[in-house]
Amino acid sequence: MSFFKRKSKSPSPSAQPSNIDTYVPPPPIPIELDGYSQTTKNRLMSTELAEDIRNILPMRYQVRTNWHLVYSLEQHGASLHTLYRMMKPLTRYDKNGYILVIRDLKNSQFGCFVNEYLHPTDLRRFYGNGECFLWKSKRQGDDVAEEMGGEANHIQFKAFPYTGLNDFIIYCTSEF
């Protein structure tokens, strides 16, 4: 999507700039998360985390407001083949990006954005491009509240974009 603004013509270069305001795009539409079953206890993706991730996605992905859960360890079981099957696009023209979210034992989260669906490749072939990135987040809050068992109230988010040092982005195998 492109936005254009007509430039006002000034009678001379020394004339005062016009009072026409510059275009300010509206705030993004909030992200809606769907796909979790009602019984799912460990919902790793929150709307707050999704908004942090959306801010660094390529522009064509930022406009998407409905994010659908493709695979959950809790809902679909611990199977790499199931993950690959669930991610496979319905058509070859389906160009979705995917976000992987993992929670560690310290309740921090990390993951990645990949611009292609995960699938095993032969002969150690890598795929993906420089749009892919890694990220991590940790809930931060008042230290006293955390010590007292209260819930932290802010996510500290950090992204690690593609460096261009090599093209080894995504590699998947069914050998596990």
From Swiss-Prot:
TLDc domain span: 43-176
Name its cellular compartments. Mitochondrion
Main location per the UniProt record? mitochondrion
Spell out the InterPro entries in the cross-references.
Answer: TLDc_dom (IPR006571)
Q: Which UniProt keywords apply?
A: Mitochondrion
Instruction: Identify the GO cellular component terms for this protein.
Output: mitochondrion; nucleus
One Pfam family, short name please? Answer: TLD
Gene Ontology terms: biological process: response to oxidative stress
**Superkingdom in the source lineage:** Eukaryota
Report residue spans for region: Disordered: 1-26
Family the entry assigns = Belongs to the OXR1 family.
Q: What does this protein do?
A: May be involved in protection from oxidative damage.
What is the name attached to this protein's record?
A: Oxidation resistance protein 1
State the species of origin.
Cyberlindnera jadinii (Torula yeast)
